[in-house]
């Protein structure tokens, strides 16, 4: 017991702010017993001041491409509101941000990079704050968060933003230019060019995922998303966007404020989905109803060192634990999460049973069902508020959206929900996953009452 108390005393030293801080943390910090729960392999590190934590995570509503409420909204006008929200809701000085990394997929690289820089200016960031983009297909938003976490951990800066943006109205999926003839010599390279829907059919056929299983997954996604919307569960994560709708016939503009996802269909049933024809294969099972929606939207996540969050008195929404990106056969790219999730969970010193919630992107019902079954996951833990088949999948923004949805749900569930995972498949044959820990442990330290005596004893021992 004495060794444990001494070890905790050393850990607490990591949390003490610099001498320049005016807050008296000496009296507010005390050691208390920490257990790893059911996972003995997991080494509790959540008291370290150099943990990378998330203090805010927000997103726009997600709207149907070309037909939804963002059809007349510029991409930079989607990103700016969520960047601004991070600053306004935390009262952070924007000049303190070391970098803004934005995941984005479809737009030309140099153009989208300029749009993201412009959005930062709209949001109130000074010229001294750098901006860059990152593209790892559908995991780009999560990759942006992971890149920022890694940079903070490496000491490049203490505060950063990982974001995601996609306007599939503005930038539809299309290959520009000719294809290198050399691709014909490499089967796997050829498979990188397969339409995503064809890879979905490959997964369904190879692993025996039935049409009914896929349609049922879509029904469940819409049902859960509709229930979450009705219960107001998305209000904490969604930032309303003021924009416009343009009448295509008259050109008249109508100002609107978008505050809810517009692709959710509460009345979706197996019967209605069963009437839809396969899209990618004559006798296939992948339809418009059991695939993710083509969407417009953005999301942003504010990360910093835990010690900085404590100095600023900011509640911690979550702790970034690990990230993994893996490669799989491009012809069945949808299996990516089934490989990436175990890799990320293992890197965190955990087992799958330790994870309380999963946000797994529903690119296609076929691959979602396969990954769920392959890993033997409890359906009650996965996409509890619906997924991309109902909410939408704006490629570059999905990772940031999933992080926001996961962390706010973990916060609502409290101590019964400690670890969460975000994961998705990636076009051309990859998968990505990240592990997060619920972040309110720091609040207990920050809000702890002054301890006059027996400062190194746990509450149970006093």
UniProtKB/Swiss-Prot annotation:
The gene is PED1. One of its GO terms (molecular function) is acetyl-CoA C-acyltransferase activity. It comes from Arabidopsis thaliana (Mouse-ear cress). It comes from the Eukaryota. Its EC number is 2.3.1.16. One of its GO terms (biological process) is positive regulation of abscisic acid-activated signaling pathway. Accumulates in etiolated cotyledons and in seedlings, also present in roots, flowers and siliques (at protein level). High levels in wounded leaves. Disulfide bonds join 138-192. Belongs to the thiolase-like superfamily. Thiolase family. Keywords: Acyltransferase, Disulfide bond, Fatty acid biosynthesis, Fatty acid metabolism, Glyoxysome, Lipid biosynthesis, Lipid metabolism, Oxylipin biosynthesis, Peroxisome, Transferase, Transit peptide. It catalyses: an acyl-CoA + acetyl-CoA = a 3-oxoacyl-CoA + CoA. Its main location: other. Forms homodimers. SUPFAM superfamilies: Thiolase-like (SSF53901). Disruption phenotype: Defects in peroxisomal fatty acid beta-oxidation affecting germination and seedling growth. Etiolated cotyledons, which exhibit glyoxysomes with abnormal morphology. Increased number of siliques with small size and reduced seed number caused by increased ovule abortion. This is 3-ketoacyl-CoA thiolase 2, peroxisomal. Pathway: Lipid metabolism; fatty acid metabolism. The active site is at residues 138, 393, 425. Induction: Expressed in the dark, repressed by light (at protein level). Induced by dehydration, by abscisic acid (ABA) and by wounding, both locally and systemically. Induced by natural and dark-induced leaf senescence. NCBIfam families: AcCoA-C-Actrans. PANTHER family: 3-KETOACYL-COA THIOLASE, PEROXISOMAL. GO terms for cellular component: endoplasmic reticulum; glyoxysome; mitochondrion; nucleolus; peroxisome; plant-type vacuole.
């Amino acid at each position: 017991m004495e060794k444990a108390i001494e070890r905790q005393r050393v850990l607490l030293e990591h949390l003490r702010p610099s001498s320049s801080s005016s807050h008296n943390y000496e009296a507010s910090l005390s050691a208390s017993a920490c257990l790893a729960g059911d996972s003995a392999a997991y080494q509790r590190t959540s008291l370290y001041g150099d943990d990378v934590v998330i203090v805010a995570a927000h997103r726009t509503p997600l709207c149907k491409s070309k037909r939804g409420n963002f059809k007349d909204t510029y991409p930079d006008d989607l990103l700016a509101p969520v960047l601004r929200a991070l600053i306004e809701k935390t009262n952070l000085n924007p000049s303190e941000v070391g970098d803004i990394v934005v995941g984005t997929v479809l737009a030309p690289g140099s153009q989208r990079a300029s749009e993201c820089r412009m959005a930062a200016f709209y949001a109130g960031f000074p010229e001294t704050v750098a901006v860059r983009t990152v593209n790892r297909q559908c995991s780009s938003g999560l990759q942006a968060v992971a890149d920022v976490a890694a940079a903070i951990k490496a000491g490049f800066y203490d505060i950063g933003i990982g974001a995601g943006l996609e306007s599939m109205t503005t930038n539809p999926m299309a290959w520009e230019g000719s294809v290198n003839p050399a691709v014909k010599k490499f089967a796997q390279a050829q498979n990188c060019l397969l339409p995503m829907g064809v890879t979905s059919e490959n997964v369904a056929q190879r692993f025996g995922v039935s049409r009914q299983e896929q349609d049922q997954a879509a029904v469940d996604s819409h049902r859960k998303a509709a229930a979450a919307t009705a219960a107001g569960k998305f209000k904490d994560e969604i930032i309303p966007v003021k924009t416009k709708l343009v009448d295509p016939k008259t050109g008249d503009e109508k100002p609107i404020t978008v505050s809810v996802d517009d692709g959710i269909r509460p009345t979706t049933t197996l019967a209605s989905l069963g009437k839809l024809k396969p899209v990618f294969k004559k006798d296939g099972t992948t339809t418009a109803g059991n695939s993710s929606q083509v969407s417009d939207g953005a999301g942003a996540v504010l990360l910093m060192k835990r010690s900085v969050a404590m100095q600023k008195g900011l509640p911690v929404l979550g702790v970034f634990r690990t990230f993994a990106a893996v490669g799989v056969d491009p012809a069945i790219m949808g299996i990516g999460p089934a490989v990436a999730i175990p890799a990320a969970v293992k890197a965190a010193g955990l087992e799958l049973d330790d994870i309380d919630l999963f946000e797994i992107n529903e690119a296609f019902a076929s691959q979602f069902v396969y990954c769920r079954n392959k890993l033997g996951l409890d359906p009650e833990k996965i996409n509890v508020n619906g997924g991309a088949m109902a909410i939408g999948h704006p490629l570059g923004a999905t990772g940031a959206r999933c992080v926001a949805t996961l962390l706010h749900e973990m916060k609502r569930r409290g101590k019964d929900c400690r670890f969460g995972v975000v994961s998705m498949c990636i076009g051309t044959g990859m998968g990505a996953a990240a592990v997060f820990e619920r972040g309110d442990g720091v609040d207990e330290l920050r809000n702890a009452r002054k301890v006059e005596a027996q400062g190194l004893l746990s509450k149970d021992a006093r």
